[in-house]
A protein has these predicted regions:
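Compositionally biased linear targeting/interaction segments
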Residues: 1-413
Length: 413
């Protein structure tokens, strides 16, 4: 009898183990299914965002503000869009409100809470050549690591690539840095955001004049003073000054638009200054990389730009018209300081052709967070990169409400 009971107990134990294994297998299958469906829901959210961005693509010359339809879509993650049994929450933000890592200058880097080692190493990573800066690093350093690799020596591909650079740690990138010592800083602002929230890639904007046409490229080889006078709507003598100055530059090219502002008869003339800011460019491209949109950027980002003090940055943000700055020359009402106007000519804009789509897809109890970079290419919103976050708290990092407070059934639209 004892033997029979022991045998029965063994069988029951085996059945229990088998049942537990089966339950685990079912749970795993359900989790995988929910993970897949949540990601599909997030991807659907990205596609939904593209339809909203089409209005910007249809009028790329118009100013871009966060109060536009695309900017209020999803109520900063507070609205849930239901598709079948799944749902997604989303937010679209202007990518041109950030500093572009592939165009950021040493002077701008110096106004971020970074050490000289981090600045030198970043520039060495991005630039060609094998001679490191004093506190930087090239292949000799990276090849000596336990897992060796080479310097990029080119454009960064992702923001998280920063973590491969000497001196750049997760703490530096993701946490607010308040104790960084950098004697090269020209501003004294107290950081309130992590560097990760201030920088990006592929930050594009449009170079259009008030009529919606491409700005006049003052570096165009065959551009005459008469043509510049007509196109930019400035007196012939000012146009002649600009063309003559261009012709004595190295390679007969201006390297910065601000060089024009400092020419005789230009900087002190408000009418001509407006034309320089609104109607001139130094590139043939209608799409420009690395300019900051004053309609969407925070004062913290703006004050990183040399020549743009914290007071002026706050004035730009606080003085924004309800429908945004229409033309860059409107900054003249904020300040006539020449250092600021020099910065404005080289680094600021009122448009954008690049956006970040933040989306959280949900299926069952599972959520998947994605962030897509969308650029306007040939009047079509185009996804150029999608990243799935390794953080479990992305809605919190995006400062979203914990839960949505409104629901939209897309099936009924």
């Amino acid at each position: 009898m004892v033997v029979v009971l022991a045998a029965l107990a063994g069988v029951l134990a085996g059945v229990a183990i088998y049942s537990m294994n089966q339950n685990d297998a079912v749970k795993t299958s359900i989790n995988r299914s929910e993970q897949r469906r949540a990601k599909l829901a997030a991807e659907a959210g990205i596609q939904y965002a593209l339809t909203a961005l089409q209005t910007v693509a249809d009028a790329p010359q118009d100013p871009v503000t966060s109060d536009d339809d695309w900017g209020i879509l999803g109520s900063a993650g507070a609205e849930s869009f239901v598709v079948g049994n799944e749902s997604f929450r989303l937010q679209i933000v202007d990518n041109a409100a950030r500093l572009d890592l592939n165009t950021i200058t040493e002077a701008q880097l110096s106004n971020l809470p970074l050490t000289q080692e981090q600045i030198d190493s970043f520039l060495d990573w991005r630039e060609a050549g094998q001679t490191p800066r004093t506190d930087g690093a090239k292949d000799e350093y990276y090849n000596g690591l336990s897992v060796p690799y080479n310097t990029r020596e080119g454009r960064l591909q992702t923001v998280t690539e920063l973590l491969q650079i000497k001196g750049w740690t997760p703490d530096v990138l993701y946490n607010v840095q308040t104790n960084t010592v950098n004697s090269g800083r020209t501003n004294n602002n107290e950081p309130v955001s992590p560097i990760f929230d201030l920088v990006s890639l592929d930050c594009y904007s449009g170079a259009y004049n008030p009529e919606g046409n491409g700005k006049t490229n003052i570096n165009q080889a065959n551009l005459t003073a008469q043509q510049l006078s007509q196109n930019a709507q400035i007196p012939i003598q000012n146009a002649t000054t600009i063309i003559n100055s261009r012709n004595i530059q190295p390679n007969r090219q201006f390297v910065r638009l601000s060089q024009v502002i400092n020419l005789p008869g230009i900087g002190g003339n408000q009418t001509v200054l407006r034309s320089v800011l609104d109607r001139m460019t130094i590139s043939p491209a209608v799409r420009v990389q690395g300019l900051i949109n004053i309609n969407t950027a925070t004062a913290e980002v703006l004050s990183v730009l040399p020549g743009l003090t914290e007071d002026i940055a706050n004035q730009i943000v606080d003085s924004r018209p309800t429908d945004g700055y229409k033309q860059l020359s409107e900054v003249l009402t904020v300040s006539g300081d020449m250092a600021f106007l020099t910065t404005a000519a080289d680094t600021l804009t009122v448009t954008s052709q690049s956006f970040r789509v933040r989306v959280v897809g949900k299926a069952g109890r599972t959520t998947v967070s994605l962030e897509a970079i969308v650029t306007l290419t040939n009047s079509i919103p185009t996804v150029i990169r999608v990243e799935q976050s390794n953080f479990s708290n992305m809605p919190e990092r995006w400062t979203w409400a914990e839960e949505s407070n409104a629901t939209t059934l897309l099936e009924n639209e």
